[in-house]
């Protein structure tokens, strides 16, 4: 369990509790989670060591137009890593469901309402795109860049999170490379439900021992944290134990409740070059 799973800030969340589904617009359904909960544990101060965003894809976004005809769209939301709060995912789902039987005059009105509400919950301006389904007709299914480190003939007997598995992972050779793994799995901080993801690590610096890196990533398998928190933990652990001069950690998680979350943290830029989905998304 996480060190802060019993924090008072989490006590009022609807996550893990039986809830009613509203179908009329209700911004009060959104619930923030202070980023400081895990950042204090990681000993991160006000000056963050990374840039980044949490990129959400909204696959179940629907409302009624002014004549009552249902509209459907796919939303993309970019929440800055500098925001005071992340947005709890079940509350996000319930909030989106509240649009289902609500009339809006234009698509622009929906975008503006989403932007206003999500920014208020996050505590910082959020970027929202609302796109018609055919916007994605020719979008490719992609994989992560670089080399996959998963095909290693190693034995693993422990699945308890252990950052010290990265000790000695930095070699003597200086490289610039991209590695990825599809074996990232952690558990929801509140419900203990599994969260499945892939993670891409782009870095410049001492060459990483791929066996040590894979063992470290697998150690998240029984770890309880939200997606965004896991990615920040990976970033800070790599910085601590391996000290690269450049580092980007980008995870893409499978969707739940019509939402997927793709946290991006980097020393170089605040967003990835694209937001194309992967096979498991």
UniProtKB/Swiss-Prot annotation:
Pfam families: QueF, QueF_N. The active site is at 188 (thioimide intermediate), 195 (proton donor). The keyword Cytoplasm applies. Substrate binds at residues 87-89, 227-228. GO terms for cellular component: cytoplasm. GO terms for biological process: queuosine biosynthetic process; tRNA modification. HAMAP family: QueF_type2. Belongs to the GTP cyclohydrolase I family. QueF type 2 subfamily. Homodimer. This is NADPH-dependent 7-cyano-7-deazaguanine reductase.
């Amino acid at each position: 369990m996480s060190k802060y799973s019993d924090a008072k800030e989490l006590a009022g969340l609807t996550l893990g509790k039986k809830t009613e589904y509203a179908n009329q617009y209700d911004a009060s359904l959104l619930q923030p989670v202070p980023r400081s909960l895990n950042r204090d544990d990681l000993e991160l101060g006000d000056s963050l060591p990374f840039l980044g965003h949490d990129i959400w894809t909204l696959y179940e976004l629907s409302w009624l137009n002014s004549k009552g005809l249902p509209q459907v769209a796919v939303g993309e939301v970019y929440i800055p890593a500098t925001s005071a709060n992340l947005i709890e995912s079940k509350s996000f789902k319930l909030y989106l469901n509240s649009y289902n039987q609500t009339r809006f005059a234009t698509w622009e009105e929906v975008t503006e309402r989403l932007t206003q509400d999500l920014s208020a919950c996050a505590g910082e301006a959020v970027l929202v795109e609302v796109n018609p389904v055919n916007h994605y007709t020719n979008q490719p299914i992609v994989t992560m860049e670089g080399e996959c480190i998963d095909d290693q003939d190693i034995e693993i007997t422990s699945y308890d999170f252990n950052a010290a598995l990265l000790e000695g992972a930095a070699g003597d050779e200086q490289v610039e490379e991209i590695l990825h793994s599809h074996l990232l799995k952690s558990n929801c901080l509140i419900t203990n439900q599994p969260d499945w993801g892939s993670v891409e690590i782009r870095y410049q610096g001492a060459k990483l021992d791929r066996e040590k890196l894979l063992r470290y990533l697998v150690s998240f398998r029984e770890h309880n944290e939200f997606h965004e928190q896991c990615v920040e933990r990976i970033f800070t652990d790599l910085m601590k134990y391996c000290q690269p001069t450049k580092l980007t950690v980008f995870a893409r998680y499978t969707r739940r409740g019509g939402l997927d979350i793709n946290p991006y943290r980097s020393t170089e830029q605040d967003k990835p070059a694209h937001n194309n989905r992967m096979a498991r998304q």
